[in-house]
Amino acid sequence: MKTTVAVLGPGAVGGTFAVQFLNADDRTICVAPPATVQLMAFSGISLETNGSPPHVGRPEVTEHLSFPVELLLVSVRPDQLQDAIERVDPAAVAEGVVLPLLNGLEHMGPLRERFPGRVAAGALSRFDAYRVGRMQIVRKTPMALVTMGSDELPREELERAGRILERAGI
């Protein structure tokens, strides 16, 4: 059975990770506003890594996540967080890990309120990517390092999330 992963905010970080999850054969769903969903459904996500030819990934796309996922990666802009998390039904992560990869700690309050007991603290390093188009990403680093921890989630759940990331080369 495939692991189901959702990416909330498929920009440079989220889009890169979505393609990596697809390459690891995970069921990958990107959650985004209507215009982005339409564009992704049409073009997919183009990812160029270290000057290699672009690879196009075609994740599932939706405006609202309502079915269960094992991992929800949150990578939206801070000013879009509140609207973005409304796109995810809390029941969808009732048995999953919510992993924000955002700067600062201000986002933890709204995430914990929306998804009580499901949020890990996450940090991303050794990663450099940027968008050259709406769904075109250039990645300059060969790998990414994600560190996560939680006082609320059981160790086994964090380890399961870690294995999902490792399989995707993260």
Task: Please place each PLM-identified region on the residue numbering.
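NAD(P)+-binding Rossmann beta1-loop-alpha1 motif at the extreme N-terminus of oxidoreductases
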Residues: M1-P53
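Nucleotide donor/acceptor-binding cores
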Residues: T3-T4, E70, R118, A144
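Active-site-adjacent beta-strand anchor residues
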Residues: V7, C30-V31, V74-S75, P100-L101, ...
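Internal alpha-helical scaffold of NAD(P)-dependent oxidoreductase catalytic cores
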Residues: A24, A91, R114-V119, R134-I170
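Rossmann-like NAD(P)(H) cofactor-binding subdomain of soluble oxidoreductases
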Residues: P54-I137
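Short, conserved catalytic or adaptor-binding loops enriched in Gly and charged residues
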Residues: G51-V56, R163-I164
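Short, charged/polar "capping" segments at the starts of alpha-helices
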Residues: T36-M40, H107-G109, E156
